[in-house]
Structure formats: structure tokens, C-alpha cells
């Protein structure tokens, strides 16, 4: 009877369950979307109970549709949308408020207030993060401040906090395991990434009682077992956890110092493994934990691109220039160049290394000869220029020149983007055979803990290259194109409309 690892990939818009065999191949996928809540402009929330039921349903569907018995599952790995925050009553098991999603800006005032009091550097020094609504700490404070009776309950030890991984493990284990892993803890603004402990000073600044917080564990160990009635009569070890971007890094077998992966999703996320050294960034990158394994912690530098694949969605849904995303490859390839057109997709500001929340999208270099093909090509190229921006910041901070870039996410299917990416960063771009690297990373972490795979070398050997894109552009052309991009970004930042 063949054995498997089941990976739960709990994302921002859907929950998925994916089955992996010993070879790291996908044997089945089930997916369910859930509702997004937008109570006020800039706020994004989820119903944590709906997330839980969506996870239960995709697991059941996955096993049923693939005729798999629960006793064929050796372990469960969990990867999750990071930073999204749940606070629940440990006695009733019910959340006291919606989950506040990583995208939500409702805690901006808390962040501004802490900055005005001069605490930004304190948070940065201990957590490697910016004082921004993106991260979990201010979300917890907001819930305690705004839900009647919550603060008193928290101080009495009746409330629990967790990122989505914690919430799912607590539910799957029958309320016995209140834990998280290093990668998720490192995204909370409450965890000291050097001491590897919840930080008392930061908790005091946020006014969050320590007893609410989960125990922090490695990314690969047995945290507990499923209770039989949640998993079809079986007690299966829950054995691997990582936030989505760190899971993708692990799934890409980026185990060595200097290994880099870039995910082209709605936004873009680049992570560089910096080994056992936490590199402090001077270039607008985040310092975070890559994974905790075998008693050691590996750190990472992370860069965020706010608009990546969503720029292609905009061509389709906003401008109606295309009917489907794959068409962009054909259009972009019909012309030799953009003829000097640059598109800066700063629809929600600019991320790394600019961190300019007020910048807005812009198009430069239009002429009477500009056609749809030039416009589409400029949009695709913008993904690659932004990636170079982040890569240069990483090389500067780490002192490591990136030799090759491993890629995943929806846009990697586009050969034009991949080739232009290789050209503009002047390094090879490696597209793997299995592109579900986030779920695969969580599966690998769980599989290592239960002995399904032997060690990192065993995993490294299973990473398979589908296509390698090598740079073909000469240095003069590369320099000219990238210089034009930098001018376009600068002009975008200068243009500001008054309220």
C-alpha cells in the first residue's frame, strides 16, 4: 500500500490539500475558495471558522477522489498565508473576531503612534521587520482594544492568539496543541529572531499578555496528532509547518547560503537563504527566519514586490487588452522591444527597496507608434525589472552575487517573462518540474520529521529542473534598459497628487 504526505496549503483566497508520494510527485489536489470580507476601505478579514471548514472539506475530498485511506497518510504538513491573525476563546473554541488578513491596513494608526513615540528601531532591531500593519502584532492589539471584554479575558488566560498555522493545529489536534513554528513567529513583530523567544519589551509596547501566545517550535517536528474524528478514524502526525514563502524556499531545495527563490504570484516574494547568520538590511529588505531544523535556525533576507501577476490580471480585467494571461507571451514576442515604453505598476505603492506607499502606477515613453504589443511587453518586463531591484538589494546587503534564480508561481509558465528575467539580471533562471513548491516545502518538512524522507540531501536530489533560461542580452543593452527603468521609477515617485 503506497504511503503519502498530505500538505495543507492555506492561502489568502482558498484552501488546498495536496498529496505527495515518496518521489515528491503530486498524486492529487483539492481546492476550495472562501469569502473575503471588506468591512471598511483598506480592511481585509476572513472568517476563521470558514477557513477551518474549508480545510476539513478539501482533506476529505482529496482522500475520497483519489481512493486513499487515511492510514496511508504518514504525516501532515501545513503552509499558510503569513501574518493573518486569529484570536479565539480557548474554552468555547470560537474566534472573538474575524481573522485580520495580512493585507489589511486597519492597524495603521497603531503603527503610526508607535513610530511617533520612537519605537520603530526597537522593533526593527529585534524582529528584522518594519513597523507596518502587514505584521501580526498590531492586529492582536487592535482586536484586544476593540472587542468588548477581550483584554480582561486575555489577561485571565482565556484567549489564545495564533497565525493560521496555530489555529489549524489547535483544531486538528482536538485543542491540545497551541504551537507555531519559527517562520510564522518571525512575522509577528513580537518574536526576537536572535534569542528565538517572545520578546517581553515588545509585548509590553503592544500591551499583549504573553499567556495568549503559542509555544514556538522548529519547522519540522511532530507537534501533535489529528484526533480520529477529524481525520477519518486515524491519528496522523502533524509534523511540518512553514509560512508560505519560507515553505517555497524549502520546496525549491534552497538549503545553502546564497540560494535564492522568487515567487511570481499576485505579488512577488524573493527570499535568499543567508545560512545561520541573520543579515541586517540597509536596503529595505526584511530579515526573517527561513526555517528551523535539527536544532539550528537558518535566516533569510526577503524582498516584497506588491504587484506582479496582478499586473497581468489588470491587462485582462481592467484594460481588456487580453482575454487570458497566456496570450501575453504571444503579444510580447511579436515586437523586438517596447520601443522605449516603461510601465511602473505601482498600483498600491512600491515595495522593496523603495517602500513608497504613495507612489501610483505610471506609463512612460509613449509615442504615436506605440501599439498594444508594446504596452503588454512593457507590463511583462516590469515584473523582471522589479525582481532585479530586489536582487541587487540582496547582493548589496549579503555580499553574495546571485548566480542562479529558482522560480515558482503562476507567471513562470510564461517563457517570455522567464527569458527576459534571465537577460535583465544576467543570471540563469531555473524553472522546476514541480511548481507547487509551497505545498511541497510543507510536505518535505513533515516528511523529514516522520522519516518519510531521510535528510535535506535526499530532498535536494529530488529537485528536478524543467527549463533553464540563460542570459542572451549583451551588457550594453542590459545597462541601457535597466537605466531607463530606474528613471521611470524616479519619475513615478515625483508625481504626487494632493488630496
From Swiss-Prot:
Key enzyme in the regulation of glycerol uptake and metabolism. Catalyzes the phosphorylation of glycerol to yield sn-glycerol 3-phosphate. One of its GO terms (molecular function) is glycerol kinase activity. Keywords: ATP-binding, Glycerol metabolism, Kinase, Nucleotide-binding, Phosphoprotein, Transferase. It comes from Staphylococcus epidermidis (strain ATCC 35984 / DSM 28319 / BCRC 17069 / CCUG 31568 / BM 3577 / RP62A). ADP binds at residues 12, 16, 266, 309, 410, 414. Sn-glycerol 3-phosphate binds at residues 12, 82-83, 134, 244. This is Glycerol kinase. The modification Phosphohistidine is found at residue 230. ATP binds at residues 12-14, 266, 309, 313, 410. The keyword Nucleotide-binding applies.
Amino acid at each position: 500500500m503506497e504511503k503519502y504526505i498530505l500538505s495543507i496549503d492555506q492561502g489568502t483566497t482558498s484552501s488546498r490539500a495536496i498529496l505527495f508520494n515518496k518521489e515528491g510527485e503530486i498524486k492529487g489536489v483539492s481546492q476550495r475558495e472562501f469569502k473575503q470580507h471588506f468591512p471598511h476601505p483598506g480592511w481585509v478579514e476572513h472568517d476563521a471558522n470558514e477557513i477551518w471548514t474549508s480545510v476539513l472539506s478539501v482533506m476529505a475530498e482529496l482522500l475520497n477522489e483519489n481512493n486513499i485511506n487515511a492510514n496511508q497518510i504518514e504525516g501532515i504538513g501545513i503552509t499558510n498565508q503569513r501574518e493573518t491573525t486569529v484570536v479565539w476563546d480557548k474554552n468555547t473554541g470560537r474566534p472573538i473576531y474575524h481573522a485580520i488578513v495580512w493585507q489589511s491596513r486597519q492597524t495603521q494608526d497603531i503603527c503610526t503612534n508607535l513610530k511617533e513615540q520612537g519605537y520603530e528601531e526597537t522593533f526593527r532591531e529585534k524582529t528584522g521587520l518594519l513597523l507596518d500593519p502587514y505584521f501580526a502584532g498590531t492586529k492582536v492589539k487592535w482586536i484586544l482594544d476593540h472587542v468588548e471584554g477581550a483584554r480582561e479575558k486575555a489577561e485571565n488566560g482565556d484567549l489564545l492568539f495564533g497565525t493560521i498555522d496555530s489555529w489549524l493545529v489547535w483544531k486538528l489536534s482536538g485543542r491540545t496543541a497551541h504551537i507555531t513554528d519559527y517562520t510564522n513567529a518571525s512575522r509577528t513583530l513580537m518574536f526576537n529572531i536572535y534569542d528565538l523567544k517572545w520578546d517581553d519589551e515588545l509585548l509590553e509596547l503592544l500591551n499583549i499578555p504573553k499567556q495568549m501566545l503559542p509555544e514556538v517550535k522548529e519547522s519540522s517536528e511532530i507537534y501533535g496528532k489529528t484526533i480520529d474524528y477529524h481525520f477519518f478514524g486515524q491519528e496522523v502526525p502533524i509534523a511540518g509547518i512553514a509560512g508560505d514563502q519560507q515553505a517555497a524556499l524549502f520546496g525549491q531545495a534552497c538549503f545553502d547560503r546564497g540560494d535564492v527563490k522568487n515567487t511570481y504570484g499576485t505579488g512577488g516574494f524573493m527570499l535568499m537563504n543567508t545560512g545561520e547568520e541573520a543579515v541586517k538590511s540597509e536596503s529595505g529588505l526584511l530579515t526573517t527566519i527561513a526555517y528551523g531544523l535539527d536544532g539550528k535556525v537558518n535566516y533569510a533576507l526577503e524582498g516584497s514586490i506588491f504587484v506582479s501577476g496582478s499586473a497581468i490580471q489588470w491587462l485582462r480585467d481592467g484594460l481588456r487588452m487580453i482575454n487570458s494571461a497566456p496570450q501575453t507571451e504571444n503579444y510580447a514576442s511579436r515586437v523586438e522591444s517596447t520601443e522605449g515604453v516603461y510601465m511602473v505598476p505601482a498600483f498600491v505603492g512600491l515595495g522593496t527597496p523603495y517602500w513608497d506607499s504613495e507612489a501610483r502606477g505610471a506609463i512612460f515613453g509613449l509615442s504615436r507608434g506605440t501599439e498594444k504589443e508594446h504596452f503588454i511587453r512593457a507590463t511583462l518586463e516590469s515584473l523582471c525589472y522589479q525582481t532585479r531591484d530586489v536582487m541587487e538589494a540582496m547582493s548589496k546587503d549579503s555580499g553574495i552575487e546571485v548566480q542562479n534564480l529558482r522560480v515558482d508561481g503562476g507567471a513562470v509558465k510564461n517563457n517570455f517573462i522567464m527569458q527576459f528575467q534571465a537577460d535583465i539580471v544576467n543570471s540563469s533562471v531555473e524553472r522546476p518540474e514541480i511548481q507547487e513548491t509551497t505545498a511541497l516545502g510543507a510536505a518535505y518538512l513533515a516528511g523529514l520529521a516522520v522519516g518519510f524522507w531521510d535528510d535535506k540531501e535526499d530532498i535536494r536530489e529530488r529537485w528536478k529542473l524543467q527549463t533553464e533560461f540563460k542570459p542572451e542580452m549583451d551588457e550594453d543593452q542590459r545597462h541601457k534598459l535597466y537605466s531607463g527603468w530606474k528613471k521611470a521609477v524616479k519619475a513615478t515617485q515625483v508625481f504626487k497628487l494632493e488630496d
